[in-house]
Amino acid sequence: MPDDVVASDLDQEVRRDLLTLDKANADRVARHLVMVAQLLDSDPELALAHARAARERASRVGLVRETAGIAAYNAGEWQEALTELRAARRINGGTSLLPLIADAERGLGRPERAIEIARSEDHGLVEAARC
């Protein structure tokens, strides 16, 4: 990892999610997350390697699992993306990751499951609007 990559390069709100980790580990994880952000479009495989390193150090942090899922998705690693995105959704809640989860299912050759997930999201949004 380049020496000029520092934890403070990561958005303060994002770093707040790492407060459950000890300082040294949080710093290392933050630096890996910075690298993921920098490499995601230009080198998806290397971005995924950094996301995996962050996940190994902070597997119970929803943001880290979400980042690992997005990196795997960008690298075309559909099963890994699905695993990580589902874990992030369990940790964080919400429906914002459902489109990526559905598309990962499609990438695995399960378009029916993708449609089912998309419909469940639509149903959830309709129910929320009724409240």
What are these model-derived regions, one by one?
Residues 40-42, 75, 108:
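Structural motif corresponding to the intra-repeat A-B loop/turn of tetratricopeptide repeats
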Residues 38-39, 71, 102-104:
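Residue-level signature for tetratricopeptide repeat
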Residues 22-56, 67:
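Alpha-helical segment of the N-proximal tetratricopeptide repeat
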Residues 64, 97-98:
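TPR alpha-solenoid repeat register
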